[in-house]
Amino acid sequence: MLFDVYGATAPFQWLGWALVFVGLILANEIARRSKVGGLIMFGVLPLAMTIYCVAIGIGVAQGAEWALNNPTHIYQNSWFHYAKVYAALAGCIGFMMIKYKWGKLGRAHWFRAWPFVIVAINILIAVGSDFESAYHFFALGETTWVTSEGATQLAGWNNVFNGIAGIINIFCMTGWWSVYASKDEADMLWPDMTWVYIIAYDIWNFCYTYNCLPHHAWYCGLALLLAPTVANFFWNKGGWIQNRAYTLAIWCMFAQVFPAFQEKSVFVTHSTLNPTTATVVSVMALVANVAAIVYIVYRAKKLGVNPYKQEAFVGTKDFQKAMERRADTAYLLETEPASATAAEIAEMVAYNELPATGTPGYVYVAVEKDEK
């Protein structure tokens, strides 16, 4: 079994899972459907969390008992949690800049690669954590170790397999610049991020949480991963990466401020800490990502494209459905700020006018008019 969810507290554990899953979906909808909701979620709340965490840090440095006994200091003091929450927030803010075309940066075509960059950074943070556990096994000879937060982790080849899977997963992201705003500005769309990537990512990331956050994986592994995936498959096609960033940031802030939910309440759920299970899950993650990258190479060769500069999933059902959600060019032109240059507008129009089915290998080339 993966988790200890069959004892006397099982009803609370399943209830807790349902609350997290539904809560994340609802919070994501609030954040994506309005600018105010997004600014509150990723502006006001992060500021409040930062002030709270800084106050605790100052208190700890001064030896204050209230700070030393604060749950955030006890359970969420590692480098990973702080790196993850702020990296996720950076992604959310960048995505809002793209979908709302905020400033010159938000309108720049080169900035559309920001989703790739920030997702890669988030993956590398997790890979670093997996390799940290592997170090305890290979360098220190430990098959288990206890983190600074009091969490027991397994250490071994499972971390190596999943760390490699994470690195491969970075290169499973295709069409880095093919990012658009949706018709209603609710979403930033990445049409080339189809089910192939989503499934490979979800398996890898679940395995990461199972390896390195075994006492949290019931929530941050299953509920947190399924919330954006369900939204993408049922009502927000093409918006998975935004769903993922939004729900991740919201969950990380909640976990940072209210860690007792996962640590000392009736909702606490631990993994079984079974080495065989952890290894099997890690091998599955590696196999899934190898399969994904092989399929991407196959499609790239079939279409004759560079899968990173151009789209690899042109002509697929998921790709077309996402492309059909793009904002109309006429609307984009109406809302272009006065500061937009003719070159910026021409590039935006060229990409936005591509057919929903896609154009294999398309790359915009600016045409300079002869001056007479």
Language model: regions and residue ranges:
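Hydrophobic alpha-helical transmembrane segments and adjacent interfacial helices
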Residues: 44-66, 92-100, 116-133, 195-211, ...
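Juxtamembrane loop-transmembrane helix junctions in multi-pass integral membrane proteins
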Residues: 4-7, 75, 103-106, 149, ...
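An N-terminal, globular interaction/scaffold subdomain
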Residues: 2-102
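Hydrophobic cores of alpha-helical transmembrane segments in multi-pass inner/ER membrane proteins
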Residues: 16-24, 82-99, 161-176, 224-229, ...
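C-terminal transmembrane-bundle signature of multipass membrane proteins
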Residues: 21-25, 220-351, 361-363
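Generic multipass alpha-helical transmembrane bundles of integral membrane proteins
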Residues: 105-238
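Membrane-interfacial helical/loop segments at transmembrane boundaries in membrane proteins
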Residues: 1-2, 61-79, 132-154, 265-273
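Membrane-helix interface "capping/anchor" motifs
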Residues: 29-40, 100-110, 233-246
